């Protein structure tokens, strides 16, 4: 028998019993002719004592080093009071070894597992060692508890776990597809799915009513801290349910996985907020409601002043002038304000005007700012509107509305964190009433904010005849927690004429629509139930719940920000025979570039 108990489960209730444990040597110490080994496995550590009276076993223990794999048989004994370790679950006992076997030796490892300052490059290169660390073990257990909780909740609510294809057809979904050449169909390609969106809708048309899947998705896009080329999502679809019913059920799911995954209880219903309100008050559609700061519009007070920096955007229908009051922010130094000015520049802001409120009772004389002189008649009214008090600072953004929203929205979060203004640990919110369409600034084409299968809050005729489609709302909803979008969904289009109208609005011709989505459009003709769904980004959700900084910390074998695997050195080269089988070859310019 390799073991009777996990190391971390050997506690005082097993005192005087014989046990067998197996695991890695976490630490070995010599004390007065006795060898102590901290043995580690998935469940934790246990101290093993090797006495010198068994010369053969003691000699083996002397040769043992960190990360050797051992099997130990022995008796569980109570520690003396002065040697009890209250920080360990097994700290009241130790195993007095009667047999010790080296199952596997280990070369010196490239870093110590308890080192807190290992570079990410080293961690990812030796991921199998990195995953042995207690922090990573804990994170992966959290991920498992979350997925187990998801499955139980959905199973109990009548959902079926069903698989959808990984090799599928390339369809325009916003990001670039990963393409897979077909050997049996020369010059044709499969695509790895960006989501199971169309297949889960087809499952609703097939009568399965409630579907879920924890699935892998693939997007060939630029990476950030919360992006991976391959990622995992909990995908859900339902028939004959309104968005209100879906949101209520998904809220129940969220509360369940937080309770069972990280012991967090959400007692109250999640608040609701429209997209327009989120943008107006927080500058972003995924607001962090833990931070008690809001943007306030002041454009109407500044349209007629001579200061063009403010008056221009105030008069411009596409512009915005907004203020951000920071309570007791008047203590910020000139350098700190300059740093914040550089920060908003990342988002396109050309500067960061401000007013320090020294003494409101003194009127204009109590305001400290180089810009007050440009609007003396409006300054005090602005202070009143934003609720300024003595000791505050009020920042201003004036530009194109998109720039102001992004710059002040980001500044709001940064200041909230810098000044320790976060009021609570968790702040969930549903964001609803998203616009259906938006204009792509690069292509000047209309695009769907969520995806083209989201149902608009409009009839087919209204879609076709709408003068300002970017003002049309959709039946979409996002779940945001602490400023992170953890999931999103919508009611889907279940009428073939409405679907055709939306595709037409997006500039997709009938011919292209049939080429890309013909299978869906045909299915819509044969009795499609009203249906709605949602998807949770599992990696991002676990990152939030485990309080990690990157989703790379919650994925067992992640890619880097350049979409490479440090462990396996993927992507890699393939030989010419494989390319010939696929009837592929590289252009000479690419081969030469790779060789250089």
From Swiss-Prot:
<feature type="binding site">
    <location>
        <begin position="537"/>
        <end position="540"/>
    </location>
    <ligand>
        <name>ATP</name>
    </ligand>
</feature>
<dbReference type="InterPro" id="IPR004365">
    <property type="entry name" value="NA-bd_OB_tRNA"/>
</dbReference>
<dbReference type="InterPro" id="IPR004524">
    <property type="entry name" value="Asp-tRNA-ligase_1"/>
</dbReference>
<dbReference type="InterPro" id="IPR047090">
    <property type="entry name" value="AspRS_core"/>
</dbReference>
<feature type="binding site">
    <location>
        <position position="450"/>
    </location>
    <ligand>
        <name>L-aspartate</name>
    </ligand>
</feature>
<feature type="binding site">
    <location>
        <position position="492"/>
    </location>
    <ligand>
        <name>L-aspartate</name>
    </ligand>
</feature>
<dbReference type="GO" id="GO:0006422">
    <property type="term" value="P:aspartyl-tRNA aminoacylation"/>
</dbReference>
<feature type="binding site">
    <location>
        <position position="219"/>
    </location>
    <ligand>
        <name>L-aspartate</name>
    </ligand>
</feature>
<keyword id="KW-0547">Nucleotide-binding</keyword>
<dbReference type="Pfam" id="PF02938">
    <property type="entry name" value="GAD"/>
</dbReference>
<dbReference type="InterPro" id="IPR012340">
    <property type="entry name" value="NA-bd_OB-fold"/>
</dbReference>
<dbReference type="GO" id="GO:0005737">
    <property type="term" value="C:cytoplasm"/>
</dbReference>
<dbReference type="InterPro" id="IPR045864">
    <property type="entry name" value="aa-tRNA-synth_II/BPL/LPL"/>
</dbReference>
<dbReference type="GO" id="GO:0005524">
    <property type="term" value="F:ATP binding"/>
</dbReference>
<dbReference type="InterPro" id="IPR006195">
    <property type="entry name" value="aa-tRNA-synth_II"/>
</dbReference>
<feature type="binding site">
    <location>
        <position position="228"/>
    </location>
    <ligand>
        <name>ATP</name>
    </ligand>
</feature>
<dbReference type="InterPro" id="IPR004364">
    <property type="entry name" value="Aa-tRNA-synt_II"/>
</dbReference>
<keyword id="KW-0648">Protein biosynthesis</keyword>
<dbReference type="Pfam" id="PF01336">
    <property type="entry name" value="tRNA_anti-codon"/>
</dbReference>
<keyword id="KW-0030">Aminoacyl-tRNA synthetase</keyword>
<comment type="function">
    <text>Aspartyl-tRNA synthetase with relaxed tRNA specificity since it is able to aspartylate not only its cognate tRNA(Asp) but also tRNA(Asn). Reaction proceeds in two steps: L-aspartate is first activated by ATP to form Asp-AMP and then transferred to the acceptor end of tRNA(Asp/Asn).</text>
</comment>
<comment type="similarity">
    <text>Belongs to the class-II aminoacyl-tRNA synthetase family. Type 1 subfamily.</text>
</comment>
<feature type="binding site">
    <location>
        <position position="485"/>
    </location>
    <ligand>
        <name>ATP</name>
    </ligand>
</feature>
<dbReference type="InterPro" id="IPR029351">
    <property type="entry name" value="GAD_dom"/>
</dbReference>
<feature type="binding site">
    <location>
        <position position="173"/>
    </location>
    <ligand>
        <name>L-aspartate</name>
    </ligand>
</feature>
<dbReference type="GO" id="GO:0050560">
    <property type="term" value="F:aspartate-tRNA(Asn) ligase activity"/>
</dbReference>
<dbReference type="InterPro" id="IPR047089">
    <property type="entry name" value="Asp-tRNA-ligase_1_N"/>
</dbReference>
<feature type="region of interest" description="Aspartate">
    <location>
        <begin position="197"/>
        <end position="200"/>
    </location>
</feature>
<dbReference type="Pfam" id="PF00152">
    <property type="entry name" value="tRNA-synt_2"/>
</dbReference>
<feature type="binding site">
    <location>
        <begin position="219"/>
        <end position="221"/>
    </location>
    <ligand>
        <name>ATP</name>
    </ligand>
</feature>
<comment type="subunit">
    <text>Homodimer.</text>
</comment>
<keyword id="KW-0963">Cytoplasm</keyword>
<dbReference type="GO" id="GO:0003676">
    <property type="term" value="F:nucleic acid binding"/>
</dbReference>
<dbReference type="InterPro" id="IPR002312">
    <property type="entry name" value="Asp/Asn-tRNA-synth_IIb"/>
</dbReference>
<dbReference type="InterPro" id="IPR004115">
    <property type="entry name" value="GAD-like_sf"/>
</dbReference>
<protein>
    <recommendedName>
        <fullName>Aspartate--tRNA(Asp/Asn) ligase</fullName>
        <ecNumber>6.1.1.23</ecNumber>
    </recommendedName>
</protein>
<dbReference type="GO" id="GO:0004815">
    <property type="term" value="F:aspartate-tRNA ligase activity"/>
</dbReference>
<keyword id="KW-0067">ATP-binding</keyword>
<keyword id="KW-0436">Ligase</keyword>
<feature type="site" description="Important for tRNA non-discrimination">
    <location>
        <position position="31"/>
    </location>
</feature>
């Amino acid at each position: 028998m390799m073991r009777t108990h996990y190391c971390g489960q050997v506690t005082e209730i097993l005192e005087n019993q014989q046990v067998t444990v197996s695991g890695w040597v976490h630490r070995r110490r010599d004390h007065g002719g006795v060898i102590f080994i901290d043995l580690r496995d998935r469940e934790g550590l246990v101290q093993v004592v090797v006495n010198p009276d068994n010369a053969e076993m003691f000699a083996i223990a002397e040769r043992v080093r960190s990360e050797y794999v051992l099997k130990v048989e022995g008796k569980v004994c109570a520690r003396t009071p002065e040697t009890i370790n209250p920080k360990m679950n097994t700290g009241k006992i130790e195993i007095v070894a009667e047999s010790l076997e080296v199952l596997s030796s280990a070369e010196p490892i490239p870093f110590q597992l308890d080192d807190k300052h290992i570079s990410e490059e080293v961690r990812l290169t030796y991921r199998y060692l990195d995953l042995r660390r207690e922090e990573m073990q804990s994170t992966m257990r959290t991920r498992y508890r979350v997925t187990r909780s998801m499955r139980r909740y959905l199973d109990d609510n009548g959902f079926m776990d069903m698989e959808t294809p990984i090799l599928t057809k390339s369809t325009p979904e916003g990001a670039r597809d990963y393409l897979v050449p077909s050997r049996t169909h020369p010059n044709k390609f499969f695509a790895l799915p960006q989501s199971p969106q169309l297949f889960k809708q087809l499952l609703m048309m097939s009568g399965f009513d409630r579907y879920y899947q924890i699935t892998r998705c693939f997007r060939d896009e630029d990476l950030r801290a919360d992006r991976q080329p391959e990622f995992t999502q909990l995908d859900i679809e339902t028939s004959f349910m309104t968005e209100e019913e879906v949101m209520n059920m998904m809220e129940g799911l969220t509360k369940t996985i937080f309770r069972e995954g990280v012991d967090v209880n959400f007692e109250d219903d999640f608040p609701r907020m429209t997209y327009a309100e989120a943008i107006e008050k927080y500058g972003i559609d995924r607001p962090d409601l833990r931070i008690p700061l809001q943007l306030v519009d002041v454009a109407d007070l500044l349209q007629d002043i001579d200061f063009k920096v403010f008056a221009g955007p105030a008069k411009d229908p596409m512009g915005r002038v907004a203020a951000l009051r920071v309570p007791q922010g008047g203590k910020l130094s000139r350098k700190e304000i300059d740093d914040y000015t550089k920060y908003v520049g990342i988002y396109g802001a050309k500067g960061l005007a401000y007013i320090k409120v020294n003494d409101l009772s003194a009127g204009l004389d109590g305001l400290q700012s180089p810009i007050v002189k440009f609007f003396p008649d409006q300054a005090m009214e602005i202070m009143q509107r934003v609720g300024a008090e003595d000791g505050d600072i009020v920042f201003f953004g004036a530009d194109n509305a998109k720039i102001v929203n992004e710059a002040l929205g980001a500044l709001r979060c940064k200041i909230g964190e810098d000044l320790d203004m976060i009021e609570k640990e968790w702040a969930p919110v549903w964001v609803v009433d998203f616009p259906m369409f938006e204009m792509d600034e690069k292509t000047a084409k209309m695009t769907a904010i969520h995806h083209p299968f989201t149902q608009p809050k409009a009839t087919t005729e209204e879609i076709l005849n709408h003068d300002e489609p970017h003002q049309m709302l959709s039946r979409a909803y996002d779940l945001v927690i602490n400023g992170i979008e953890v999931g999103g969904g919508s009611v889907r289009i279940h009428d073939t004429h409405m679907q055709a109208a939306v595709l037409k609005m997006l500039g997709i011709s009938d011919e292209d629509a049939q080429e890309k989505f013909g299978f869906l459009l045909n299915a819509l003709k044969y009795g499609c139930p009203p249906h709605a769904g949602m998807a949770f980004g599992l990696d991002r959700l676990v990152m939030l719940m485990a309080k990690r900084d990157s989703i790379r910390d919650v994925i067992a074998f992640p890619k880097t920000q350049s979409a490479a695997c440090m462990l396996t050195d993927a992507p890699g080269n393939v030989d010419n025979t494989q390319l010939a089988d696929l009837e592929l070859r590289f252009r000479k310019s690419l081969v030469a570039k790779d060789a250089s």
